[in-house]
């Protein structure tokens, strides 16, 4: 089968993505995250369309959204945003960190096979219009194109192992790539071991937030497994030396830039200019692009990180349709 990326509006060739942010939050439509942090409310499509438009004027072509099942995901709003702006949006299935659900959430009552079946249904049949908030499920035409997982700080919890096992099974059945959350950047090696032991293709895994750990050896070890490292902390360093830039310099010296993708993980109103925040969705294409240039990381490097690498990482893996979960 020809390689493809599954967007919320349909399948496209990987080369059609263009400049891609690998971990974003364009829509957070209520749910426990907003209950915990009102600043997470990103339910206004009009506002986000304006924000997206400004970034697209600088060349943005695609975004991988990272809000999975029943924690503010809205396939309908993501699809509306994509139609209105022309931005390619990859919608997620999966489960976030446990704190975004609580102890009584339905995800605690499902086993590996049941969770895998739910993820596969999102990918192959369509995402529930009600985002599994219950009691009814009404599948939309908008399908998930990536599996998002949240891991605990340091090491995987028992729940994490269950969810990672389900994600591995869903990957084997569909070929969908996996995007993980590494709490404070930690635990990446254990996450990789869990996924690879479950039969996941390493080239179709991206570990998010790992640039929070500015350790050259850690990043070498992660890259050696074959997975991608998603750096999204570039605007969070304040007056300190920019650790994301330092890591990019090391990865360039070690000839490992093919293992890096970039995002912003902008999950708060305070990060978007339409809400009076900063630095805005344009950051990777203006402020950070300039900072990279000043460090000798020019247009060729930016193309690898923002175009070539995500097109490869988020393309569906070839699978054997005869395998079982």
Which sequence ranges carry the predicted segments?
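Mid-to-C-terminal alpha-helical segments outside catalytic/metal-binding sites
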Residues: 2-10, 283-325
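Active-site gating/metal-coordination segments in enzymes
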Residues: 80-84, 88-90, 94-177, 228, ...
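Active-site beta-loop-alpha junctions enriched in small/polar residues
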Residues: 25-27, 68-69, 94-98, 152, ...
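Divalent metal-coordination and catalytic microenvironments
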Residues: 23, 63, 95, 171, ...
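Alpha-helical scaffold segments that flank or form the walls of functional sites
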Residues: 17-29, 35-88, 113-142
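Short acidic/histidine-rich active-site segments
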Residues: 178-179, 232-234, 256-278
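Histidine/acidic-residue-rich catalytic or RNA/ligand-binding cores of hydrolases
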Residues: 30-34, 75, 101, 188-194, ...
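Catalytic pocket-lining loop regions of alpha/beta-barrel enzymes
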Residues: 168, 172-246, 250, 260
């Amino acid at each position: 089968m020809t390689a493809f990326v599954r967007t919320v509006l349909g399948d496209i060739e990987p080369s059609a993505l263009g400049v891609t942010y690998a971990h974003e939050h364009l829509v957070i439509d209520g749910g426990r995250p907003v209950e915990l942090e009102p600043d997470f409310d990103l339910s206004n499509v009009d506002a986000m369309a304006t924000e997206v438009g400004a970034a697209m004027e600088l060349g943005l072509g695609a975004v991988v959204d990272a809000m999975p099942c029943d924690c503010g995901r809205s396939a309908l709003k993501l699809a509306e945003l994509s139609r209105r702006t022309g931005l390619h949006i990859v919608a997620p299935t999966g489960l976030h960190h446990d704190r975004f659900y609580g102890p009584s959430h339905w995800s605690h009552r499902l086993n590996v096979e049941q969770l895998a079946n739910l993820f596969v249904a999102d990918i192959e049949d369509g995402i529930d219009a009600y985002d599994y908030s219950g009691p009814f499920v009404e599948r939309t035409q908008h399908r998930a194109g990536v599996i998002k997982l949240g891991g605990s700080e340091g090491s995987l919890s028992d729940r994490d192992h269950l969810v990672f096992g389900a994600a591995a099974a869903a990957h084997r059945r569909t070929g969908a790539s996996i995007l993980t959350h590494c709490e404070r950047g930690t635990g990446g090696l254990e996450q990789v071991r869990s996924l690879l032991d479950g039969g996941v293709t390493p080239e179709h895994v991206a570990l998010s937030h790992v640039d929070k750990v500015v350790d050259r050896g850690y990043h070498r070890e992660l890259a050696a497994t074959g997975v991608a490292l998603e750096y999204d902390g570039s605007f969070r360093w304040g007056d300190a030396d920019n650790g994301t830039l330092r890591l990019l310099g090391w990865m360039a010296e070690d000839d490992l830039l093919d293992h890096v993708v970039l995002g912003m993980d902008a999950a708060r109103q305070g990060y978007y200019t339409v809400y009076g925040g900063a630095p805005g969705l344009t950051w990777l294409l203006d402020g950070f692009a300039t900072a990279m240039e000043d460090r000798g990381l020019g247009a060729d490097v930016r193309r690898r990180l923002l175009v070539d690498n995500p097109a490869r990482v988020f393309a569906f893996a070839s699978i054997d349709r005869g395998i079982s979960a």
